[in-house]
Amino acid sequence: MYLKKFKLINFRKFAENENEIEFTDSQGIKKADDGSINIASTTTLLVGKNNSGKTTVFEALDKLVNGNSDSNSKPKFTFDDFNYEYIKKLVEEYGNDKYDVLPSIEFVLTIGLDKGKDDLIVNLGHFIPIGYDPDEIKIFAKYEVVESEIFKEQVKNEINSEIYTEDNKIDCFYKLSKIINENLFNYKLKYYDENGNEIKKFKLSNLIDFFKIQANKVTTDDCLSAAFNSIITARNKSDKFYDTTLTESHIEGINKELEDKFNTAHTNEINRTLTSITDNDITVKLRADLTFEKIIKNIVKYEYKENNNFVPENQFGLGYTNLMVIISKLVEYMEKYPESSFNSKINLIGIEEPETYMHPQLQELFISHINEAIEILLQQHEKNINSQIILSTHSSHIVNSKIHSGGTFNSINYISANGTNARAVSLNDNKISPDGETEKDDFKFIKKHVIFKASDLFFADAAILVEGTAENILLPYFISNDNTLNKKFITILPINGAHALVYNNLIKLLQIPVSIITDIDVVRNDSESEDFKQITSIKDRDTTNETIRYYNNNSYSLNDVTDYFEDENIKVFFQKEENGYIPTSFEESIILANYDNEVVNSALKSTKPRIYTEIVGEPVNYKNNKDNSYKWQCKLSDDKTKFANELLYEMMTTDSIINLPNYIKDSFDYIKSKLEK
């Protein structure tokens, strides 16, 4: 039994669509046959930029599972939990005297059932029709008004067609917020089955246990000691470790010895003093109250050594301290249930943004470190921890860690902004694989290539896929000098033209604007290549570029190609006419757009001094660069990186910016137009 899906309807940033989170299955943190543990493959990831809605998922689970009680310390629903766009629509409806819908927040929890396993589903009995043997069960939770007529009358008095206007709709919004806040006592969380029948006397906390490890828990100088204390205390409670630690009888013996000494030394004198000042028969006895927890917390001190030198705890690295705090919380939770007991609950462990304080390498290895630590700490246990781990992050390194350690894109939920609302997209291998087959080389390439900046796609405002090394070197500089693009996170992913297609499905799922900058790769015959013939037209020409072929109706012919290709959020850019010629590479485009530019000429001369003199002549005629641009392309074929670095050096040391080739400029304009919407 496990949480399979979780839909949030009109809760905070989540509206009525694109609002479902998918979770990994119920295998939980279990040992394989070889005794190893792999948390990555059983971890659900919530990824996205800051303020996208990742924490909202945790807050919803926390309020649903842990907040449905009368305790003031428990998380409660408030007006701020309602989706603001939803409230605005309701205000407009009420302003037109339509009161059919009252403000509510809804959740749908899909519970997966493991066939053939001993799932104890007594808590789900009321949700299962008699004689029905389902693979999954849906629970509908609704936070709604109980006394609806009273609430409706209040709304009618404050917001109606006589009061509501375009000019005062903001005032009406605040009126509704006030009504909701004043009626929170009139709201109740109710549960329904798939047929809309209310299920009474049901508590979600009897079915689900949600344990949250919050971000940035390194708040004091003794956090590391507290983490170790927690681990040792948990291990001490386990029968496996009981004989190797201080037993209760040992501690009781110490308490008795202390009591005897205290009473012998002090109690008689104190009691004589009390008798002398009061008529009542009052005496006092000193009792020792030493416990294992008090010993660990207050008496035992940790000393840390590094290269035989003692290191104070407050000088220990914050990243490693944070990692140990997370591990200690996990172990503490795992020790909650004895090995012999059967846990009939769905156990959710939420880890919020664990990358806090961690350097990139530690983030990259985060999941493997968790694996190793838990495996060592639980190596003498036989228990299977029936838990699902949910991890939120805005670290591309942790995304890499999940994909590479788990070998899959499954259970990655991408959360992004969709206007003022959040948008959740659940990824999996079948959705991302170019042809739906996860065993083919293209998909294997994605999983391996994702470590080379591809995971930045999950956190970028836009992306540019480039053909080669020179573009990857120079485009970041061009972007940094663009006053619009330099305010956004534009990730540049180096990948050749053919392999750009591999990312097609993933890019469309993410829905960020993406430009693919590729070479037109015009086919030349042998004589044209040998004579360095310039291209002036693509009529009756073919290309060898697989990306262009794909978007050109599977045709290599350039005869009907008049403009760039666009497909949903993807646009493919390739070279067009530049100063009378059509370049066929990025380097040739740079030369044609800047044939008489001093910075470009200096870079050409530094890269290929003999060829430079041969082409421009004596005296120097810059026009020769333009008329021999393809020759330059051929001569630079083995020195593209050197040319790009020389050009970058010249631009940075002279604070110069060169003319962008037309197709690069068009690519930037496309990204800007999409980001402005």
For each of these PLM feature ranges, what is it?
Residues M1-N66, E303-Y304, N308-K448, F452-K453, ...:
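Switch/communication elements of ASCE P-loop NTPase nucleotide-binding domains
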Residues F6, K89-G95, V122-F127, N186-K201, ...:
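Short alpha-helical segments and helix-capping/turn motifs at coil-helix boundaries
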Residues R12, L113-K117, E144-E149, K217-T220, ...:
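Conserved nucleotide-binding/hydrolysis micro-motifs of P-loop NTPases
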Residues I39-I111:
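Membrane-embedded alpha-helical bundles of multi-pass transporters/translocases
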Residues F79-D81, Y86-L102, V108-E248, E437-D441, ...:
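Glycine-rich phosphate-binding loops of NTPases
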Residues P103-F107, P134-I139, N206-F210, K345-I346, ...:
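Short glycine-/polar-rich loops that comprise or flank the Walker A/P-loop
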Residues L207, A215-I351, I376-H381:
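Extended helical coiled-coil dimerization/tether regions that scaffold
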Residues I415-K677:
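Acidic, divalent-metal-binding catalytic cores of TOPRIM
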